[in-house]
Amino acid sequence: MARRATGQSGGPGRGAVKGARRPELRLPPLEPFRDGELEPDGDYDSLEFREEDLTGHDGGGARFMDCALKGCVLDETRLHHARILDSALTGPRGVGTDLAEATLRDVELLDARLGGVQLHGSVLERVVIRGGKIDYLNMRKARLRDVVFESCVLVEPDFGGARLERVEFVDCVVKGVDLTEATLADVDLRGASELEIARGVDRLAGAVISSGQLLDLAPVLAAQLGVRVEG
């Protein structure tokens, strides 16, 4: 169970941006999951899912509370509208996992290897995504508050129309991000080791970037402003 959340303001010289509050998970003793198949609107409390192959399972609308998922396969797993609370997901892998309109609160997602994850319309609050690689992450119209992306690789993540508040990118690679119509507040991009914005550079109001990132983004910013650079 998550008891407290810790906030990090970034320390001296990090500016006035408000740091994300991280979850502190304290899971109770867990029982192994033995049901074999996820069920729509199922209720899963204090369970450990260890190396379960959940390919194609339908857990739409299910609630996961104080759970640990370790090394599970999530190919085309349907978790639409699921609620994942006070839980840790370690080493999940899969393509096309459907978490559209799901709620993730006080969650750690560690060392994920995922592609085409659908999180559009989802709500993430006090979530840490650390390690691993996620390709083509769909977070269109999602709401992220107190979320940290740390030491991970994000390839072409789509935050179109999303709202990001107190979101940090720490030692991670962000390639081809789409910020079209996104709203940012206290978003700290300074820790991203690589930052490439494909669309929506005009939506950076509310974010903080480093001077080096500003130089890297100069061509994109100039193109957005219609400025021609010669010589």
Descriptions of predicted regions:
Residues 8-14:
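Short glycine-rich, low-complexity segments
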Residues 1-8:
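N-terminal acidic, proline/glycine-rich, low-complexity intrinsically disordered segments
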Residues 2, 18-231:
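Tandem repeat scaffolds
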